[in-house]
Amino acid sequence: MRKRARIIYNPTSGKELFKRTLPDVLIKLEKAGFETSAYATEKVGDATTEAARSLEQNYDVLIAAGGDGTLNEVINGIAEKPNRPSLGIIPMGTVNDFGRALHLPTDIMSAIDVIIEGHMTRVDIGKMNSRYFINLAAGGQLTQVSYETPSKLKSIVGPFAYYIKGFEMLPQMKAVDIRIEYDDEVFQGEALLFLLGLTNSMAGFEKLVPDAKLDDGYFTLIIVEKANLAELGHIMTLASRGEHTKHPKVHYKKAKSISVSSFTDMQLNVDGEYGGKLPGNFLNLKQHIEVFTPNDIKNEEIIEQ
């Protein structure tokens, strides 16, 4: 019996490469036994709406082609529903954090091959208040880097654009008095930022969570206490090597449930996009989504980053 697949794609991602390649993608999937149709997003929220509609129409497979923002929208369209379809991913963004974590190829046809081969892995996702995320949630000025970095700069220098913007923002950073409750522990004090990670790759930092596991039901919680400019620059340098976890101003914990509050405004970042402001309640949904992954990589290699 032929499987029904629905492609949801951002036509502007990757310099419109997927849009131009779509006819070949449809032919390849058709030959592999998939009855496939496609939907192009036009504005924020379209991918969420279409993903929910596709689920109601009983598609077996959803394929998200775009950056981490497109993938996040698709997840938000299906996360609350039963009988969720399997998820295929074609990484077309600047950084593609989740795709990196799953070792997915960035070549379009190679990514389609991963879906055709049919090897799947169940992964955790996070819930923040009423919305979902698949890679990270964070708070603090530095976490605004991903959505404040100019698109033109990202297109020119790729992921390095985030480093440039990050160092540019360092002098502006201010600590916020914050309360973070996680499982049976509490952090209360001044912090520059906090971050909840589901994978090892965030804004191009592939070693930010060096011991990330994608299916264990735990977030990695990183809290950076108030620090001076030199200390913060040092922490960022250490983070590029995965050595920040031992810095005295860095708290590195594992938790299933986290609650964050403050009397001061703090913006939130969810999968690289603006996520509102505190307070935030975060819950890890263990092995909630089934995604296609390369079959020449063992699950343990994906899960134990």
From Swiss-Prot:
Pfam families, per the entry: DAGK_cat, YegS_C
Presence of the UniProt keyword Magnesium in the record: yes
Coiled coil residues, start to end: none
Domain DAGKc: 1-132
Biological process terms in GO annotation: phospholipid biosynthetic process
Catalytic reactions of this protein: a 1,2-diacyl-sn-glycerol + ATP = a 1,2-diacyl-sn-glycero-3-phosphate + ADP + H(+)
Positions that bind Mg(2+): 213, 216, 218
GO molecular function, one term: metal ion binding
Keyword vocabulary terms for this entry: ATP-binding, Kinase, Lipid biosynthesis, Lipid metabolism, Magnesium, Metal-binding, Nucleotide-binding, Phospholipid biosynthesis, Phospholipid metabolism, Transferase
Broad enzyme group: transferase
Catalytic residues (positions): 273
NCBIfam families: PRK13055.1, PRK13337.1, YegS/Rv2252/BmrU family lipid kinase
PANTHER family named among the record's database cross-references: LIPID KINASE YEGS (PTHR12358:SF106), SPHINGOSINE KINASE (PTHR12358)
Task of the protein: Catalyzes the phosphorylation of diacylglycerol (DAG) into phosphatidic acid. Is a key enzyme involved in the production of lipoteichoic acid by reintroducing DAG formed from the breakdown of membrane phospholipids into the phosphatidylglycerol biosynthetic pathway.
The protein, known as: Diacylglycerol kinase
